[in-house]
Amino acid sequence: MATAEPAPAWWKLTFLRKKKSEPKVLYEIAGDHSSNGGEAPGTTDAATDSQFNARLERIVDKTATKGRHVKVSHSGRFKEKKRIRSTLAENPELFPEAETTANENNKSGK
């Protein structure tokens, strides 16, 4: 009987991936901005800090409003939240002026 060679580990090739050497950077690190070369302290620090703060605010603004209407279920699927609008008939106290004008229109039509 011939001995069978061990089967190649094909599943390792499909499921195990090589790690990428450099991860994707989504934002800049604050350490890069704080280390200014040999420039005079105080003159450019305020300008770079304000630019850096402006960039951070833009990043925060984008992420704050991005997924508010989407809910992730336990299975990992995204579900859109449906908003139910209330009509004026259900909430007449929202616009009391609309109620008085509607009553005046009905009186004049009679």
From Swiss-Prot:
Residues 29-51, 65-110 are annotated as: Disordered. Residues 100-110 have a biased composition (Polar residues). Residues 65-85 have a biased composition (Basic residues). InterPro entries: PRR15. Belongs to the PRR15 family. This is Proline-rich protein 15-like protein A. It comes from Danio rerio.
